[in-house]
Amino acid sequence: MQFSTVISALTLSAVAVFAQETVVSDGVTYVDVTETPEVTVSAVSTELSTSTPYSTTTLAVATLETYAGDNSTSTEHTVEPYSGAALKQEVLGSSLVGVVALVAALL
């Protein structure tokens, strides 16, 4: 029991070093987690609950990564303009049916 308690305390202290949480008065929580010096993950969570049966939850996650590659070689690429239909009518119709079904399922 004492060994697991020590491990839990060490784990919590290690997480506290890498995650920094800021809570503001409006119920908005900002969390910045740094996994390595090259990768930073930021999350913003907003939760609003009232006496009515309505509640709003927003979660946004952004990841920034630094690219490290081999600069000794290079590859030439060309960009070709696309010519064709932007969206077929059948695809558009099925997409709208899918969106309506999804909204109906959520309500």
Swiss-Prot record:
Keyword Membrane applies: yes
Domain of life per record: Eukaryota
Keyword flag Signal: yes
Keywords on record: Cell wall, Glycoprotein, GPI-anchor, Lipoprotein, Membrane, Secreted, Signal
Entry GO terms, CC: extracellular region; side of membrane
UniProt-listed CDD domains: TOS6 (cd22955)
Post-translational modifications: The GPI-anchor is attached to the protein in the endoplasmic reticulum and serves to target the protein to the cell surface. There, the glucosamine-inositol phospholipid moiety is cleaved off and the GPI-modified mannoprotein is covalently attached via its lipidless GPI glycan remnant to the 1,6-beta-glucan of the outer cell wall layer.
Subcellular location: Secreted, Cell wall; Membrane
Residues making up the signal peptide according to the UniProt record: 1-19
Primary site of residence: secreted
Topology relative to the membrane: Lipid-anchor; GPI-anchor
Propeptide residues, chain positions: 85-107
Glycosylated position list: N71
Residues covalently joined to lipid (GPI-anchor amidated glycine): G84
Similarity remark: Belongs to the TOS6 family.
Record protein name field: Protein TOS6
Gene from which this protein is expressed: TOS6
